[in-house]
């Protein structure tokens, strides 16, 4: 059973690249054709790369690794938070702070500050040592820290792999990952540099539907890796499965039973819709 089908990718617009004037020549080998001034990505190749990325993520997690989900553009924020949370992995979906990986010691101090503020009862003015104005300022500080660092509150070490949506926008994350030798799994749109990514997935990184589909696939790989990790622990008679892992297992089994239905008919890349659907317009940053 494939982790994703050609039909799913076509239906979610994974094949739409950027306008032909906005491209990286290094992506030429991943382009199927050009239609109405838009590059069409070769989804047959994408399927193969998805399988490789899926296996890499699954194996990494099965051996105890952590996957950091990164996507701060509007089209990716919801999917990044939702899927990372579903599988208990850290994520960054609002703003990448410089040094988030390379200067983690400083970032961890900000995380400690956030946790400290979360202990404050902002509704109990009389019982606190702060004035109303001070509590208001502290609440704003807490909310700002939670937006930026809430997704990595439990990250204690360098992640084993990083899933990135839009490597051009997340160039700071890419640079830091490369400095630390952390492999990158990422969607490669036609304007990206494939040399920056260890496990590329040629596809549309501007469409909410495309980003959601591919991020879900990566999260599914994490889920499968967690199951494999737990099975290994069970054989070694180690600690029992955590509650969230048990829920994840139940969801995974339910999904497998649903997928047992006849597989959707695959369509070759050449059968991409003739009309060129416009990508979701990038939201203002």
From Swiss-Prot:
Keywords: Ribonucleoprotein, Ribosomal protein
GO molecular function: structural constituent of ribosome
Disordered as annotated region, ranges: 229-285
Biased composition annotated in UniProt, kind: Low complexity: 260-275
Lineage of producing organism: Bacteria, Bacillati, Actinomycetota, Actinomycetes, Micrococcales
Assigned protein family: Belongs to the universal ribosomal protein uS2 family.
The keyword Protease is assigned to this record: no
Gene Ontology CC annotations of this record: cytosolic small ribosomal subunit
Segments of skewed composition (Basic and acidic residues): 243-257, 276-285
Protein's recorded name: Small ribosomal subunit protein uS2
HAMAP family associated with the record: Ribosomal_uS2_B
GO biological process: translation
């Amino acid at each position: 059973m494939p982790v994703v089908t050609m039909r799913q990718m076509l239906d979610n617009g994974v094949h739409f690249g950027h306008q032909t004037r906005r491209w990286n020549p290094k992506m030429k080998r991943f382009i199927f054709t050009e239609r109405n001034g838009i590059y069409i990505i070769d989804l047959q190749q994408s399927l193969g790369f998805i399988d490789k990325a899926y296996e890499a993520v699954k194996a990494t997690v099965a051996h105890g690794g952590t996957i950091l989900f990164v996507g701060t553009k509007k089209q990716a924020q919801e999917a990044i938070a939702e899927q990372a949370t579903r599988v208990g992995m850290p994520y960054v979906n609002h703003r990448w702070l410089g040094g988030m990986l390379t200067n983690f010691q400083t970032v961890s101090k900000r995380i400690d500050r956030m946790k400290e503020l979360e202990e404050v009862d902002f509704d109990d003015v009389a019982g606190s040592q702060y004035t109303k104005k001070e509590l208001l300022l502290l609440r704003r500080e807490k909310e700002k820290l939670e937006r930026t660092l809430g997704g990595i509150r439990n990250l204690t070490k360098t992640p084993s792999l990083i899933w990135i949506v839009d490597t051009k926008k997340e160039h700071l994350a890419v640079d830091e990952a490369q400095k630390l030798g952390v492999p990158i799994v990422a969607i490669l749109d036609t304007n990206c540099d494939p040399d920056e990514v260890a496990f590329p997935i040629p596809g549309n990184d501007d469409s909410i539907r495309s980003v959601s589909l591919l991020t879900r696939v990566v999260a599914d790989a994490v889920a499968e890796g967690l199951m494999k990790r737990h099975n290994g622990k069970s054989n070694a008679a180690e600690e029992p499965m955590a509650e969230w892992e048990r829920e994840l297992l139940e969801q995974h089994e339910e999904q497998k039973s649903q997928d047992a239905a006849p597989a959707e008919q695959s369509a070759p890349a050449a059968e991409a819709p003739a009309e060129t659907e416009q990508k979701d317009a990038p939201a203002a940053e």
